[in-house]
From Swiss-Prot:
Keywords from the named record: ATP-binding, Cell inner membrane, Cell membrane, Membrane, Nucleotide-binding, Sulfate transport, Translocase, Transport
Organism of provenance: Vibrio vulnificus (strain CMCP6)
Origin: domain of life: Bacteria
Catalytic reaction annotation: sulfate(out) + ATP + H2O = sulfate(in) + ADP + phosphate + H(+); thiosulfate(out) + ATP + H2O = thiosulfate(in) + ADP + phosphate + H(+)
Enzyme class: translocase
Highest classification ranks of the organism: Bacteria, Pseudomonadati, Pseudomonadota, Gammaproteobacteria, Vibrionales
Membrane-topology annotation of the record: Peripheral membrane protein
Protein's name in the database: Sulfate/thiosulfate import ATP-binding protein CysA
Molecular function as annotated in GO: ABC-type sulfate transporter activity; ABC-type thiosulfate transporter activity; ATP binding; ATP hydrolysis activity
GO cellular component: ATP-binding cassette (ABC) transporter complex
Amino acid sequence: MSIQVSGLCKHFGQFTALNNVSIEFPSGGLVALLGPSGCGKTSLLRVIAGLERPDSGTVAIQNRDVSGLDIRERQVGFVFQHYALFRHMTIFENVAFGLRAKPKARRPNEATIKQKVNRLLQLVQLDWLADRYPAQLSGGQRQRVALARALAIEPQVLLLDEPFGALDAKVRKELRRWLRKLHDELHITSLFVTHDQEEALEVADHIVVMNKGQIEQIGTPEEIYRTPRTEFVYQFVGSSNRLYLEDSNGLSFTPSDVVSTHGKQAKRIYCRPHDFAVNTQHRPDAIPVAVARKLALGNMVRLEAYSLDNQQLVEVELSNHDPVLDEIQAKRHLWLTPKTVSQFA
């Protein structure tokens, strides 16, 4: 089922959570709403779900206007960050809850409920825990139960609000892989909110980057990372170093957003930490830096250095097999040449 959002505005007092947001989410896609805290991503999800009413604008599911309907009438499944499982119910009873709570005319019989719940528990690989209680499960297992419960009512769309935010890094990575596999089996239209760029890049078919209540860019993970349309997207998705173009031949760092040099307006340009060529010998066309720290991070080494021109921090990432690392120690001077840059006016 596709989702159409048109002209959504939402205010909380003087704060603008959504500012005239319009977007269509394709049927069967897994879409990440990505952005910093307060950008509007959770407000957008809650308005689509019917948990919040917009000040203006409409929400349609499969071209049917649902703006005036509450969450039960919209046929959406919603998964919260903190599970929201009933502690006094078994895992089986938690998953069955939505089915048993349906109006009598639409409520399945107990045999059908049992069959559906058992099938869902098998799908999320927790059928062997059906008689346990939430307190007896790990955080990752509880989140899978919450997802099974959301799927039990056969929703038209699935909405997830930072579903892995309360879990540790290793469990998050396992569940991201599991969610992607599950979606490929079910093909249900799904939106998930996250502030974790790695999570969005790894899991989603498409990413919607939001900032200050508006959409900055929509694209595939590769498009968002490789061809950011705005300065905000470049800075938010992936690590970056800010530079400015002094003239046609030279690059230099600056702490300012816009710099005028010799009467010329400098462009703001950026370089990823892994896109520097590192030289241990002086080069007149390179950026001179002094190494402050050398950090071993698994298969990568990160250098924290400071520009000799203005003391701006520069991050450089190298493979831990790079031979130049043997020559690099703290306080060592290096010369950096950007191999690839992105420019913004």
